[in-house]
Amino acid sequence: MELFIKLPFIQPIPFSIILVTTVSIVLLYSVFFWVTDKKKKRKKAPNAAGAWPLIGHLRLLMNDKEPLYRALGSMADKYGPAFNIRLGNQEVLVVSNWEMVKQCFGNQNDKLFSNRQTTLAAKYMLNQTTSSGFAPYGPYWRELRKIMVQQLLSKQSLESWKHLKIKEMDASFSKLNELCNNNGTGTATLIRMDEWFAELTFNVIARNVFGYQSGGRSTALTNGDTESKGERYKKTLEEALHLMSIFAVSDIFPSLEWVDRLRGLIRNMKRFGDELNSIAGCLIEEHRQKRLQSVSKSDKGVGDEQDFVDVLLSVAEKSQLPGDDPDLVIKSMILEIVSGGSETTSSTLTWALCLLLNHPHVLKKAKEELDTHVGKDRHVEESDTPKLVYINAIIKESMRLYPNGAMLDRLALEECEVGGFHVPAGGRLFVNVWKIQRDPSVWENPLEFKPERWFLSNGEKMDVDYKGHNHEFIPFGIGRRMCAGMLWASEVIHLVLPRLIHGFDMKAASANGKVDMAEMAGMVICFKKTPLEVMVNPRE
């Protein structure tokens, strides 16, 4: 017989229902408290001291005396290879250890940290939603990245554009010779080599991307004025990159975007972003017109002078370009490749020359290697570079000490653990590449510039590359968002530096014969703070 509980004025309830309900409630409470207790027990990385109310460790980003990666490197010495800092109300896990990097990006885990933090500059100036540099990870990003890597920046593609790269390099070296010879004294000439590197790398990449020719006026690129569209793009890009270095309040406190609006920062970002898109739009339209006029020359449109824009237009014509606005996607790719490729490559060359000038015995050894393998009757060619093992070691050592991407900034796609420490979905991760590449447990005498460290005791070169396979050496980044233009940059660096060493005698212009190695205060990029002034003279 079913048992009932009878209460006055209440309909009788079967005891079985009460029992099931009671057990269910107890189970639900047990699960709730178990989950809550588990969350409480999740291990968190140690919190760095010194956080201020409301803003946390924000002062580290606003420090105009020390780069962020150095400040975080000093904190790693105190708190260990993983610790938390707070930026506003956002907690950031900072890792400075190659084993933890391997956990984040090794094997199948590289997808975990494949998103990036949005920024004010990306939103208003860099076409955030259509750029592979800032678009969220997903089908659109994967398709865009595939086009960049396979059709623009692959080894085969770069080989087809090699003649354009060489033409611009030849023009830049001719200009350097001209500057040296114009003083009429036969003595060394004072040259701002950081500026020369910047001009060379922009000219090379702009020639590949949209057909820009330095030292001349291409009718396709002139605006009817004395200045080509390529030159306008370069000047506007320099201003835009300067704006990116200005701290934006809303990058930390999104609700305070109105502050950046009042400061005029958003207005200026929009202005330069619109100008860059406008110039790129003209370049795209001119390429379209040239392709229509050259229909008889097949799909290339411009014959042997095909460039990146031509390839992207071909992809768009086949409806293979992702997104709803093909022109905006192409504009974004132009901006991403030109800005990302020229500035970082010139910075790598600048640091390499700084180190060589401060270590004349290394420079002397590099010259001897060049004289042995190349001789003195011709300049260095791309086919020579694999044989220049010591110069290749110089380049690796320079990138170890002064990596362009000194800090990687990523967001977790899902909840995970790094080094046993909990990272929530959407959690922010800083990878201190600069610190990892100076880790004394990996690198002997890590602060020394020593190209010889890249050779084994038997003289064979070490099997360590910068393609993300070796987690202790990641100057081009790591994971799915590592530098797409790594191969292009590597080719330029490995040809420009030996050609410069081979063709010119150089020494620091300072009274003490040393180059100032101070770094510019900033967040993620390792730039030289002061100009690189060098006394340059063509070798006899």
Swiss-Prot record:
It is a single-pass membrane protein. InterPro entries: Cyt_P450, Cyt_P450_CS, Cyt_P450_E_grp-I, Cyt_P450_sf, Plant_Cytochrome_P450_Monoox. Keywords: Alkaloid metabolism, Heme, Iron, Membrane, Metal-binding, Monooxygenase, Oxidoreductase, Transmembrane, Transmembrane helix. GO terms for cellular component: membrane. SUPFAM superfamilies: Cytochrome P450. It comes from the Eukaryota. Gene3D superfamilies: Cytochrome P450. One of its GO terms (biological process) is isoquinoline alkaloid biosynthetic process. The keyword Calcium does not apply. It is an enzyme of class 1 (oxidoreductase). Belongs to the cytochrome P450 family. It holds the Pfam family p450. It catalyses: (13S,14R)-13-O-acetyl-1-hydroxy-N-methylcanadine + reduced [NADPH--hemoprotein reductase] + O2 = (13S,14R)-13-O-acetyl-1,8-dihydroxy-N-methylcanadine + oxidized [NADPH--hemoprotein reductase] + H2O + H(+). Cytochrome P450 involved in the biosynthesis of the benzylisoquinoline alkaloid noscapine. Converts (13S,14R)-13-O-acetyl-1-hydroxy-N-methylcanadine to (13S,14R)-13-O-acetyl-1,8-dihydroxy-N-methylcanadine. Pathway: Alkaloid biosynthesis. This is (13S,14R)-13-O-acetyl-1-hydroxy-N-methylcanadine 8-hydroxylase CYP82X1. Highly expressed in capsules. Expressed is stems. Heme binds at C483. Its cofactor is heme. PROSITE patterns: CYTOCHROME_P450. One of its GO terms (molecular function) is oxidoreductase activity, acting on paired donors, with incorporation or reduction of molecular oxygen. It comes from Papaver somniferum (Opium poppy). The gene is CYP82X1. The chain crosses the membrane at residues 15-35. It is found in: Membrane. Its EC number is 1.14.14.167.
